[in-house]
Structures are given as structure tokens and as C-alpha cells.
């Protein structure tokens, strides 16, 4: 496992905000994002997830890019969630992560409800 540098922490911040792509993050940190030792992981905030949803709603990122982002921030050691925000964040990520499945349809209204749940720090419950 490789250790992460301060410059790479900046790259994590940029990826968190979707200002760089996964491939750009891999160029900075390493191809296998699941095997990078990170003593100080980047903390994902509820506002970061809201930003990702809004970028998707506005057409700035694709569904695939959103799902890829969810998988990186949720399933690598590079990112963590603040304990008081974790339930709200995970309740939304759990739904967003399924968006690439064949029968998954998430409406604009559901995306808005996810933003509301994140903004109020409550768990999102799909209908």
C-alpha cells in the first residue's frame, strides 16, 4: 500500500467536489484506489453529496459519473463521513449507488427529497 501525500489530499478534495474525474484522481493517487493507505482520509460532508446530486440534476455530470463517484467515496479508504452526518449520507448513497442497475429509476422529485434529507441531516427513505 502507498501512503497519501498532502498534494494528493488536495486531489481528494477536488474529486469530492467533482472538479476532477476518477481517472485524474487515479493518475494522482494510483490506479487501484481501494489499496491506498490513507492516515487522514478526506471527510465527506452532506453538502458534498448535495453538490453531486445537483450537478447530476443540472446535467453537468452523467449518471455513470455520479454512480462512480458514489462508489469511490463510499467504498474506498480515501474518504470518511462525519459521525453526525453518516446516517443521512449513507441513506442517500445507498439509493444513488443503484442508479446504474437496469430497472432503477430515480425521479427528479426523489433527487429533491434526497437533497432535503441531506440538508436537514435526516435519513432518506425511498417511497
Go through each PLM region and give its residues.
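Acidic, Ser/Pro/Thr-rich low-complexity regulatory regions
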Residues: 1-127
Amino acid at each position: 500500500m502507498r501512503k497519501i501525500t498532502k498534494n494528493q489530499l488536495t486531489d481528494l478534495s477536488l474529486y469530492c467536489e467533482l472538479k476532477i474525474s476518477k481517472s485524474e484522481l487515479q493518475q494522482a493517487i494510483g490506479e487501484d484506489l481501494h489499496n491506498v493507505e490513507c492516515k487522514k482520509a478526506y471527510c465527506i460532508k452532506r453538502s458534498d453529496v448535495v453538490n453531486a446530486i445537483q450537478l447530476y440534476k443540472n446535467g453537468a455530470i452523467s449518471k455513470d459519473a455520479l454512480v462512480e463517484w458514489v462508489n469511490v467515496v463510499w467504498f474506498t479508504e480515501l474518504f470518511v463521513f462525519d459521525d453526525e452526518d453518516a446516517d443521512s449520507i449513507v441513506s442517500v448513497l445507498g439509493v444513488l449507488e443503484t442508479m446504474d442497475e437496469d430497472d432503477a429509476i430515480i425521479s427528479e422529485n426523489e433527487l429533491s427529497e434526497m437533497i432535503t434529507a441531506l440538508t436537514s441531516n435526516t435519513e432518506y427513505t425511498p417511497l
